[in-house]
Amino acid sequence: MRTKRYTVAIAGLMPEIVTQSILIKVWEKAAKKVCASTGIYVNAWLNESYFLCGDKREPELDGLTANFIIIWNPVEVESYEEFHEAFTQVVNGVRDILGNPYVWITIDDIEFYYFVKC
């Protein structure tokens, strides 16, 4: 099916403070809050990486980067507009909890297939 994939990169995180466990809890807290008001839970995959930007950008960008990958599943949420609004609210909630760090978001059109467990 045709759908959208969002990638949310949050840069400049301090690995001595922000761990994978903390990132998971932060996303879950924001997603549960949005779900309570909209009925839409925004699932995400979390990957960690390291951003290297050298002297061209602000030095605090160097460091741990959290990459959340989100796929809109039209079978679960029919309205793209409603999903996008819920997604935006979750990302804003995550940013608030983390102290408004640098964030990049990409949105890609993709073909998405999945198989349920039998």
Name what the model sees in each region.
Residues 9-11, 47, 71, 106-108:
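A structural detector for beta-sheet-dominated domains
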Residues 35-79:
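Short, intrinsically disordered low-complexity segments
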Residues 118:
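Short terminal or interdomain "cap/linker" segment that borders an active site or interface and mediates
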Residues 16-41:
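Short, flexible N-terminal segments of the mature chain
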Residues 72-115:
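Short, compact, well-ordered microdomains
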Residues 1-24:
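Short, extreme N-terminal segment that most often corresponds to the first beta-strand
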Residues 5-8, 66-67, 103:
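Hydrophobic beta-strand segments of well-ordered beta-sheets in folded domains
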Residues 23-28, 62, 83, 87:
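Glycine-rich, flexible loop segments associated with nucleotide phosphate handling
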